[in-house]
Amino acid sequence: MKNRLILLDGNSLFNRAYFALPPLMNKDGFYTNAIYGFAMMLNNILENYEPTHMAIAFDLKAPTFRHKSYEDYKATRKGMSDELRMQVEPLKKMVDAYGITRVEFEGYEADDIIGTLSKLAENDGFEVMIVTGDKDALQLASQSTAVYITKKGITELERYTDAEVIEKYELTPLEFIDLKALMGDKSDNIKGVAGIGEKTGIKLIKEFKSVEGIYEHIDEIKGSLRTKLENDRESAFLSKKLATIVRDMPLEADMDELLVKSTDYERLSEMFREFEFTTLLNKLKKEQLGKEQPGKEQPGKDQQEPGREKQSADIERADIIYEYDRQWLDSVESADIIINMQAEKGEESNCPDIEKLYIKNANNIYVIDAENIDDAKAILENPSNRIIGHGLKNIYKALKKCGIRIANIFFDIEIAEYLIDSNNTNFTLEYLNNKYGLENFESLEEIIGKGKKELKLIFADKERLSAYFINSLYSIEGCYQMMGPEIEKQELSFVFNEIEMKLVRVLSDMEQEGFLVDTALLRRLSLQYEKEIAELESSIYSLAGEPFNINSPKQLGVILFDKLALPVIKKTKTGYSTNIEVLEALQGKHEIIEHIMEYRQITKLKSTYIDGLLGITNDKTGRIHTTFNQTIASTGRLSSSDPNLQNIPVRTERGRALREVFISKEGYLLIDSDYSQIELRILAHLANDEIMLDSFRKYEDIHTRTASEVFNVPLDEVTSELRSAAKAVNFGIVYGISDFGLSNNLGISKNEAKKYIETYLDKYVNIKAFLSDVVTEVERTGYSTTIFGRRRYIPELKAKNMMVRNFGKRLAMNTPIQGTAADIIKIAMIKVYEYLEESGADAKLILQVHDELILEAAQEQAESLKLKIKEIMEGVAELLVDLRVDIKTGKNWLETK
């Protein structure tokens, strides 16, 4: 095999890793995301490109020759954050443990080291591969040297040889230096020539070949472009000097010194344990034992073309069975079954949402067309088979339409990742595959495109598509094998198995059932609001003295502040602010303000809710089928989208009336069950606060009691104003509100708000102690937990910025309360669902909103179901104070309130 040297730009790549991954910390509060991402990159490179020689170049703190030539070189760069700086030395030690040579040289940058080593290696007949996040390295590309630029994430790379640089940029690699000399580089504070960008720069280089060539022919260049070049002649030549990577450093390097050495498994394992890199540690153990990783190529497979990445689609990983023995398939039991589906069959099919179903067990992969979907029934409906996938809610729902109900929804890697890393917002299979160090394969986005150019699956290349779904099974399996132990390690088994995985089927059925809407009423409301909007427009034009675009903040600002001379409350970069806070501050100053506020309220209701709901009501069912999102809120709360039914306005009379359009079908009633003050009850339990516990046990109005305690007045003398203030403080404490936030909510001074909070905490001493203890514990562990064990990692508590740290404190205090409430409502949903299923009751769960569940039940069963549902929901958790559920029935949602 030809010698292959891989050179890595250490600084570029660990910066890339730091910003590509969410903040990660170990139990000691030590940040690890840059180290983790860098390790992922190293694993990917070592596995997929098999170097014989390797070196990682790092910058030193000392100034380089470029700083001596130009003292403002890189002067605009912000200093390295403490969170990143603390990871540099451990990262270098990790590189040493991998057996990879580190190279640093005072007075030069990592780029120069790479440039010099690559030239030496080329002269010795090596094939060279450079990996960096900096396009400056493209000047080093040649027939023997390929430059790999990080594309997105931490493992996806884009390859450039000299031919590929020319093809993409129409410039040779060396001409890239001249382009940077003209354009400059903000990140390095290289000035270039003011006013020349990439397009003009490329045009000049193509014509004159270099900076020197441009100035030799400056007389041929006309107009303002010539003026720009003449004004910045000195800067152009200096910029070229700064942009040129040195390839003849006084670096005495023997290629044998760069040989990839044996990994120090003991040292690396110790580091991974310290950093709590469970997945990398498991992978390292398998490598050490000589075990094959999921998705790794089979022995005997031909080596890939040197310097090219292995293509998983070409790997024969298992027997892929298109014509299979159904009898054998039916006999599979007590097995881990990995599944994925290719969607988009079409409305007319008996199986409308599935084109193909992909199933993998230990040895084989089965590809089942929609027409033969019944062949999968036995294996999926056998409760002894553990079904594992990514996004199982949608797969379960699609299969249910085909007459198949998965019996054992065992492990969803998307949900597992949501629990393992509560701050992660990316749960795509591609991201998880990269994060857990599995073999890269062509992504779905690469096959079908995205945005306006995105293809429907049925028009995509069939072979590439099939390869993607087959590879996805290995990816899901690999993630599952690594996530399972991590779930146990973080003590998340109850939350994962008993709450989140059981909830998948519940949410899927709720989405499929949908909520019936009165479309006739929606249309009447649309016409009514249209008329009211027209009347308001007329009134506003009359008061303004002229017609204008009311929806234009700029035009509205001119009317209010220039023409009507109202006091300016706030300005933005583009002019006057006319947001709701400004309008509220102007109330009473002019009659037009109330009209504008009402106009905005009605137009929002009409466009977003009235017309919006009409547009997404299913023509066949007459129902709205929202999507419940299980992996969005870090607290564990569910959210809904398309449409967001949790955001139906309730503060205004018109908003509340909107609930009237949500109805039950003929012969049925809606049952609305709502936990009463659940978060305050949880707070009373967690803090073991006698005043609050006593109030709940006596069935007192908790806000009146709080007002009595905080404002030192008898219960019977608490006014509505005092009760409102106490309510704001109660819920402010739950949500970790600041004195600034409370002052805004109550319209009082910041000092008054601060005094309210201090008085509250002086009275409720156990709550004060609880909140303080929670913050201390989170500072120690890095995460906050619910009663049931759900974790939320709070790296903000380690931040340098005081505002960010204070925000972290509020998150730490709020998470046990709000997160526990989220767990309780989810458990309640599961228990109610299971009761309805086991009892055969003619009722279905159709909506969850915050602490509220809505069912649609047969009219004759509604009263008995009310009692049973109340009993179930109030018995979900044993707290020091009873949970209480308010429950009502009605023909529409408004009637249940």
What is each stretch, according to the model?
Residues 1-131, 135-159, 235-238, 244-252:
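Noncatalytic, basic helical substrate-engagement surface that gates or grips nucleic-acid strands
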Residues 2, 51-55, 100, 123, ...:
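Non-catalytic nucleic-acid-binding/docking modules located in mid-to-C-terminal regions
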Residues 6, 10, 16-53, 71-72, ...:
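Conserved RNase H-like, two-metal-ion catalytic cores of nucleic-acid enzymes
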Residues 155-156, 162-180, 315-316, 350-488, ...:
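Active-site-proximal helix-loop-helix substrate-binding element of RNase H-like nuclease domains
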Residues 232-371, 454-650, 669, 679, ...:
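Conserved "right-hand" nucleotidyltransferase catalytic core of DNA-directed polymerases
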Residues 358-363, 420-446, 450, 468, ...:
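Function-dense linear segments that define catalytic or interfacial modules
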Residues 455-458, 505, 512, 618, ...:
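Conserved catalytic core of nucleic-acid polymerases
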Residues 534-538, 542-594, 762-810, 814-816, ...:
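C-terminal polymerase-core module
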